Amino acid sequence: MNRRTKALQFDAKTRKKILDRDHGCVFCQIGYHMHAASDFQYKQIDIMHIVNRSQGGLGIEQNGVTGCRYHHQLMDNGAKGLRHEMLAYIGKYMSQIYAGWNPEELVYKK
């Protein structure tokens, strides 16, 4: 595995920290767009990159939040035009946890 690929993945320790920090889907906790999914989609919890891996988003705590499969798909697919709104909420959430949180600092640099 090359250095960049490794830097963009959440390792087991980081995944655990994110899961422990968020206690489930950050969007379900605020009741965000809860009407269009099955119970199965709400129960499957993923770690979501805030800055996408395809954009060089690092696999670090400050670049990950938990989301159920439904909300993860909403954010990744952007089919309903909610990505910008979802990222704004995540920005506020992360800023409350990490002083000076800045998504521009979450990108891989050589």
Feature-to-residue mapping (PLM):
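Basic side chains
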Residues: R3-R4, R15, R21, R53
